[in-house]
Design a protein with these regions (language model features):
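A short, N-terminal "cap"/entry segment at the start of jelly-roll beta-barrel domains
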Residues: 1-68
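Conserved short histidine dyad/triad with adjacent acidic residue
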Residues: 54-60, 71-88
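Short histidine-centered beta-strand/loop micro-motifs
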Residues: 61-64, 82-88, 105-106, 114-115
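Intrinsically disordered, low-complexity regulatory regions enriched in Ser/Pro/Gly/Thr
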Residues: 66-69, 87, 95-97, 116-117
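Short coil/loop residues immediately preceding or within conserved phosphate-binding loops
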Residues: 72, 91, 112
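Short beta-strand segments in beta-sandwich/barrel cores
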Residues: 72-73, 82-83, 99-105, 122
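Short acidic-glycine-tyrosine-enriched beta hairpin
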Residues: 77, 107-124
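Glycine- and acidic-residue-biased ligand/ion/polar-headgroup-sensing regions
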Residues: 78, 88-108
């Protein structure tokens, strides 16, 4: 802050637009960034970071720049690799940008379903 500032750092921080929240701390703990934007020129060229919990690379995108969990993410699966299993507590919609592969899902009763996907596939 400039030496001749009219307000203290403490007061200025109360008006900061980028607030830290439990959600932003969780994303940071995942090792990922959040892109706050309404428009991204190409999802294929987003900067991705290693995502240890998922076993791939990723970045979160927050549509409303509201720094809350109203978001989506880009996740890259390396060729001939797989993501770590994840239990879903919510619905998730997947759109495949490129590549092809297969996914296995199972429910609490143990029923497993495997299906194949490719670029342009959409599944939930």
């Amino acid at each position: 802050m400039a030496k001749d500032a009219l307000v203290s750092v403490e007061l200025a921080s109360k008006f900061a637009t980028e607030k830290e929240t439990p959600y932003t701390r969780w994303v940071a703990a995942e090792g990922l960034d959040i892109i706050s934007a309404h428009y991204i020129a190409s999802l294929l060229t987003c900067d991705l970071k290693p995502w240890a919990r998922r076993g791939g690379k990723g970045v979160y995108i927050n549509h409303e720049a509201s720094r809350t969990s109203n978001d989506c993410y880009v996740c890259e699966i390396a060729p001939a690799k797989q993501l770590e299993p994840q239990r879903q507590l919510f619905e998730e919609m997947i759109y495949v940008l490129s590549g092809k592969g297969s996914t296995t899902v199972c429910n609490d009763a143990g029923k497993r379903v495997t299906f194949e996907w490719q670029a342009g596939s959409l599944f939930a």
